């Protein structure tokens, strides 16, 4: 199955920890404020495509999973026509947030189920799976 997600792909990197004054509680927050909207966009794309999404009793892939993801990144004005997105965010951190969102949406039980992975970062109009705006094309195959 194929999902198309519109929105700015966001990396899930390190978390920041801090202690709330007057308490002994530590709080962890994402280092990027864009992670939550990106994960919500991925989850929404899955749920719009497949009504099973988000229900723990309705996991789509219970076995091994093949994943193919093409992220379309915004093209900087300074980028040449034949340029590739060789800058941040890191591809592996983009995949981390996207795989976690697919898990939350009920595509698979755990991102450890992903046994094969193809991933790319492109600019709009650069290739078959590029979108005209930032986002991602995600192909999932239950093996």
How should each PLM-predicted stretch be described?
Residues 1-143:
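Acidic, proline/glycine-enriched N-terminal capping motif
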